[in-house]
Amino acid sequence: MATLILGSQWGDEGKGKLTDILCPKAQICARAAGGHNAGHSIVANGVEYDFHLLPSGLVNPNCMNLIGSSVVFHVPSFFSELSKLEEKGLTDVHNRILVSDRCHVNFDLHAAVDGLEEVELGDRKIGTTGRGIGPSYSTKMARSGVRIHEIFNEEIFERKLRQLAAGYKKRFGDLLKYDVEEEIARFKEYRVKLARYTVDAIQYMKEAQDRGYKILIEGANALMLDIDYGTYPYVTSSNTGLGGIITGLAINPTKIDNIIGVVKAYTTRVGGGPFKTEDLEEAGTKLQEIGREWGVSTGRKRRCGWLDLVVLKYSTAINNYTALNLTKLDILDTFETIKVAVAYKDPQTGEEVEYFPADLDILDSLEVVYKELPGWNKPITDCKTYYDLPKEARAYIEFIEEFVGVPICYIGTGPKREDMIVRKTSAIKE
């Protein structure tokens, strides 16, 4: 059986915390797509761990971890992240991580190109993390990329990397500050070190499913950053939703038991792109400060605003959530009134639009229709059960459930691992 944890907004919803809570029951924890642009922190046994490329199931000493075939794999970050986890006391991490031999390699070359492409775009820049994720997927789709298994054939590896570098050099000239021979030299060491981690992930996952293993899959980024369904072109370069999980891990869709959408009690976004409920006044600043809204991967401050239920309903239609995890509800503790977007409106006709349009110009022209709900004006972090919560907080939760049509089974009430209320467990298949 498999449980999926997927971001329902623009990322940074708090997926890692739920992964940490659920992974003690999992035998395998896997990532399907994305790269080391993703980032989240987990606090376990009083220690904070940062994850970017690695699955956060590594905090569970009894869990195997897999990086799936649709991930773009930055080799230096892989080893660096493993070392940092060891330094913080996690043991045996090298024996509990595997990497699909079908992953495409994310080179330092790709990061250099990423920065130049952002400069080319000027005012239309995407606001990428600068980690080379987009260029890595571009070379993958152009069929000029290098896969993990090709690292072990030195002749093929060096020829393909030199060809890739030559193509970019032709495009960018002296603006490209990159030495292909230096990167080739580094991979002579990586070639030896990587062998123990590389696996045929298709066979590995098939055997795990056939044996009935409990598999926990953590999505990277979120649905609104999906290359097909997000606010294109202000998106990442992979499929971040349900479809990307099935493709990236070759998982049997009939063996997926739970699809848990993680949704922050308000909304944040990093980088450029549409954000209809963004608040540039006092409320947005307050959310940013209380919520400590700056990125694990980049340190950039996140844009903040109210919860957008149009976005959540759209996300639900694509990912088919069976349950929701509402996170960071405690950040709203001191708000007298809480606004929630329930529709968009055409200012010319007054007609309400309840869907999320593909055309960003149309989206930009629409006004937001808000519903105002009363705040609870008291701390909730010490609440351990649903009915410990103030009635206003429960009303907020139930309004979201009714609007979206999906039960909220997990409620985050603080930063610690134990600050999570579990309810409606009948909606979750064990």
Curated annotation (Swiss-Prot):
A GO cellular component entry from the record: cytoplasm
Binding positions (Mg(2+)): D12, G39
Localization terms from the record: Cytoplasm
CDD domains from the UniProt entry: AdSS (cd03108)
EC number: 6.3.4.4
Cofactor(s) essential for the protein: Mg(2+)
Domain of life, per lineage: Eukaryota
GO molecular function, one term: GMP binding
Residue numbers annotated as active site: D12, H40
Cofactor: record remark: Binds 1 Mg(2+) ion per subunit.
Zinc-finger in keyword set: no
Keywords (A to Z) from UniProt: Cytoplasm, GTP-binding, Ligase, Magnesium, Metal-binding, Nucleotide-binding, Purine biosynthesis
Residues that coordinate or bind GTP: 11-17, 39-41, 302, 328-330, 412-414
Annotated pathway: Purine metabolism; AMP biosynthesis via de novo pathway; AMP from IMP: step 1/2
Residues that, per the record, bind IMP: D12, E13, G14, K15, N37, A38, G39, H40, T129, R143, N221, T236, R300
EC class (word): ligase
GO term, biological process aspect, one: IMP metabolic process
Main location: cytoplasm
Stretches that traverse the bilayer: none
Binding locations of substrate: V296, S297, T298, G299, R300, K301, R302
UniProt catalytic activity: IMP + L-aspartate + GTP = N(6)-(1,2-dicarboxyethyl)-AMP + GDP + phosphate + 2 H(+)
Pfam families registered for this protein in UniProt: Adenylsucc_synt
Protein's job: Plays an important role in the de novo pathway and in the salvage pathway of purine nucleotide biosynthesis. Catalyzes the first committed step in the biosynthesis of AMP from IMP.
Sequence similarity: Belongs to the adenylosuccinate synthetase family.
SUBUNIT field: Homodimer.
Protein name as annotated: Adenylosuccinate synthetase
Organism per entry: Neurospora crassa (strain ATCC 24698 / 74-OR23-1A / CBS 708.71 / DSM 1257 / FGSC 987)
